[in-house]
Amino acid sequence: MAQITAKMVKELRERTGAGVMDAKKALVEVDGDMDKAVEFLREKGMAKAAKKADRVAAEGLTGVYVADNVAAVTEINSETDFVSQNDKFVKLVKDVTKTIAEGKPANIEEADELKMDDGSTLDQAFVNATATIGEKIVLRRFALEEKTDDQEFGAYQHNGGQIGVITVLEGADAATAKHLAMHIAAMNPKVISPDELDDEFITEQLALMNHKIDQDNESRELVHKKPLPHLVYGSEKQLTDDVLAKAKEDIKAELKEEGKPEKIWDRIIPGKMQRFIDDNTQVDKQFAVLSQDYIMDDSKTVGEFLKEKGAKLVAFQRFEVGEGIEKKQEDFAAEVREQMK
């Protein structure tokens, strides 16, 4: 039987990322053959990964990487936020995101086959990570954006990598592109322009907003405050010429009823019309980035800010860890009982 030295264990650990005891056991099992030990650990890792396949991985990190005219954002999940702070996990996220930016795969299946710097595929890297870290580790999703030489990328990660954003801007400098990425991280828009919002989506969101108004009005009634009116419209898409013309006539009728002199109406009407538009584009303000108040200067919208800069937002991607994943609710008492059987 071959003698297993500390040097052999160290080499195997460097090649596979395995723990000391796992590396030593593998070398013993294959009588010191290094290549067979690597294969042994690989198969063991696949078995461990298979056992963890049905677990919910909803924690983790986003990764952001820019390589010349290509940028990638990824979401890589673990089962606990504790593991997401592990140095090995953090390095894996960086390496995988870099590999995807450079390889430009079309989907997860293609990404799994990409080779990393150490020669392993992404798929094998996740199997190894699951085995060595001890939790299910998966690439949930990724997005790629490409730009031309005269465009600019903005890249930003928030809250230690819980949110990752990339932007593509035309006619802007790097600082503007990054500031807009920061805005998107904070405000979570879904589209660039209100034109991209689906009519059914606008109707659904308007109903939710009016439901919230109803709840607020119940509280206002308790303190004898005037109830807030329901929103009639939610997007500039719904503010047709006829709608705006009627709103203007209603404002004139209101001014007349209040006894305001006609000669000052022209000074009052524009402000009231803007208020009408602001009140009836709340869905736009929540979901369309160009309609949102700019977080660096809320006296203007993002659209107004970009116009001042002579810039245009071409595309953006925003990933937040765990979006849309139903997290498993742990029953710790049941878990303890199960372990005591």
From Swiss-Prot:
Keywords for this protein: Cytoplasm, Elongation factor, Protein biosynthesis
Keyword ATP-binding in annotation: no
Signal peptide from the UniProt entry: none
Subcellular localization, as worded in the UniProt entry: Cytoplasm
Database matches in InterPro entries: EF-Ts_dimer_sf (IPR036402), Transl_elong_EFTs/EF1B (IPR001816), Transl_elong_EFTs/EF1B_dimer (IPR014039), Transl_elong_Ts_CS (IPR018101), UBA-like_sf (IPR009060)
GO MF term set: translation elongation factor activity
Short name of one Pfam family: EF_TS
GO CC annotations on file: cytoplasm
Involved in Mg(2+) ion dislocation from EF-Tu: annotated span: 80-83
Main subcellular location: cytoplasm
Gene3D superfamilies reported for this sequence: 1.10.286.20, DNA helicase RuvA subunit, C-terminal domain, Elongation factor Ts, dimerisation domain
NCBIfam families in the cross-refs: tsf
Family: Belongs to the EF-Ts family.
General function of this protein: Associates with the EF-Tu.GDP complex and induces the exchange of GDP to GTP. It remains bound to the aminoacyl-tRNA.EF-Tu.GTP complex up to the GTP hydrolysis stage on the ribosome.
Protein name: Elongation factor Ts
Gene expressing this chain: tsf
